[in-house]
Amino acid sequence: MPILNERDQAAVRKEFERIAGPVKLVVFSQSLAAPELCQQNEQLVREVAELSDQITVEVLNLAIDHERAEAYGVDQVPAIVVEGARDWGIRFYGVPPGYEFSNLIDSIIVASTGKPGLSDATLASLQALAADVDIKVFSTPT
């Protein structure tokens, strides 16, 4: 049974008209660690990828493909790496439902363009930071 209904698929296709280049979604799973969540995550990512010919999916096992996981900085499952022409460090842990789903879609578009959609003032403020910043957003299902 599909996760995305026809209305959601149409809305995502419309958003994906803004994709400017290829995007790879690297999914890390492990059937023993979180079988239901990993399966749901893989299905969702595959359904999303079917909505644009610019999106490819690679599914890796966290335990077997540990070198790739380490290279991406992934240490838990389920995980999604959103990668455009380069790796921008965009990661999703857990299945991105609800409001997080729209963030996944936006992240795919941002990764395809390489432009975060921030104002010049915000970009200047970020450039002034003395060190890298790791931003983490946590959410819980409601």
Predicted regions and their residues:
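Structural micro-motif
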Residues: 22, 66-91
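Non-catalytic, surface beta->alpha helical segment in thiol-disulfide oxidoreductase systems
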Residues: 81-116
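Local sequence-structure signature of Cys/Sec-based thiol-disulfide redox active-site neighborhoods
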Residues: 8, 12-52, 127-142
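Catalytic cores of nucleotide-enabled group-transfer and carboxylate-activating enzymes in metabolic
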Residues: 22, 59-61, 77-80, 111, ...
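Contiguous, structured surface segment used for ligand recognition
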Residues: 45, 69, 104
